[in-house]
Design a protein with these regions (language model features):
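N-terminal membrane topogenic signal
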Residues: 1-16
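Hydrophobic alpha-helical transmembrane bundles that constitute the permease/transmembrane domains
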Residues: 11-15, 51, 164-172
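Hydrophobic core of alpha-helical transmembrane segments in multi-pass integral membrane proteins
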Residues: 13-26, 43-50, 90-92
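Short, hydrophobic transmembrane alpha-helix segments
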Residues: 23-37
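Hydrophobic core segments of alpha-helical transmembrane domains in multi-pass membrane proteins
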Residues: 38-46, 188-195
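Membrane-helix interface linkers and caps
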Residues: 47-74, 94-108
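Membrane-embedded catalytic scaffold of the fatty acid hydroxylase/desaturase
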Residues: 74-262
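Cytosolic-facing loops and C-terminal tails of multi-pass membrane proteins
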Residues: 247, 257-299
Length: 299
């Protein structure tokens, strides 16, 4: 009986939780408090996934501690709590106020809001895709993005594990493009909320059966392939929310006949301490070697 219940939940968890969160956002807009209701929905999502990760994990081995919980939380506070909040809700929203004039830009403000949000997701995905892709293909940017890929398991707590520089070079072009086109503030808020919900679901260690959803959205299945140690699998699935540009540029990867690898991470060294991880991309080769030797002696 329990196995049937788990199977049923694995089929409805992703779409059910996404619909719940987006419905709460819609209600928040009707109450003129979208940010408050985003936070409420986000907490509900975290608590639900935390429970499901323990009851029906995708990888049982990933439920064990990797010693990175504190570093993950600090990275989340650094990248999401500082970079995104200051940039998006500070400077960006200030600029948005200047662009509320309907005569600015070429954005189709006469469209229904739902259609504008859908357009915003697809348009913003283009710079997100390329920022993520060059983060893998350009060694200078990979040194920052490697912090995220150095994890040896995926779960909700490392959703926000990004070097703050990594977050900046993704947020600025994506939101900046919407600004340049004249998108209203509501579209940016919806995009931010959708990205937050997708990110949490994408990184969760919950057994989910996604089916055709993985052809449209960035799902846990696709992102597990993206975290593979095999670069033929890892250098794929760059889209953050919807897979349109991966499909268009030939970087979509999915093999339904086998599970994504449980052995994930990077082959290069990454120090375990948060402070060292923040400094790591800026260090010389000699400085990195000194930290690596020190870490190996301690371990």
């Amino acid at each position: 009986m329990e196995s049937k219940i788990k199977h049923f939940i694995s089929c409805i968890a992703w779409p059910g939780l996404m619909v719940l969160c987006m419905t709460m956002m819609a209600y928040g807009f009707t109450r003129d408090r979208p940010v408050l209701y985003f936070n409420v929905a986000y907490v509900i999502l975290i608590v639900t996934l935390f429970f499901l990760e323990r009851w029906m994990p995708h990888e049982r081995e990933w439920t064990k501690s990797d010693g990175q919980t504190l570093a993950n939380i600090l990275h989340t506070l650094s990248s999401k709590g500082t970079t995104q909040l200051l940039l998006l809700f500070g400077g960006i929203i200030g600029l948005m106020g200047l662009m509320e004039d309907p005569g600015r830009g070429i954005w189709p403000r006469d469209w229904p809001l739902a259609a504008q949000v859908l357009l915003g997701v697809v348009v913003a995905e283009f710079p997100l895709y390329w920022a993520h892709r060059v983060g893998h293909e350009w060694p200078f940017l990979w040194r920052f993005h490697a912090v995220h890929h150095s994890v040896i398991k995926l779960w909700i707590v490392n959703t926000g594990r990004f070097h703050f520089v990594d977050s900046l070079y993704k947020i600025v072009p994506s939101v900046g493009l919407l600004l340049a086109l004249g998108a209203p503030l509501a579209v940016v808020i919806w995009l931010s909320a959708f990205t937050g919900f997708i990110g949490m679901l994408t990184h969760c260690n919950v057994e989910m059966r996604l089916g055709p959803l993985s052809w449209i959205f960035n799902t846990p299945e696709l992102h597990r392939w993206h975290h593979s140690k095999d670069l033929r699998e890892a250098n794929k699935n760059y889209c953050e929310n919807v897979m349109v540009w991966d499909l268009m540029f030939g970087t979509y990867f999915r093999e339904s006949h086998r599970r994504p690898p449980a052995d994930i991470g990077i082959r290069e060294f990454m120090p375990p301490r948060f402070v060292d991880q923040i400094m790591w991309p800026f260090l010389s080769q000699e400085g990195k070697q000194q930290i690596e030797v020190g870490c190996r002696l301690i371990s």
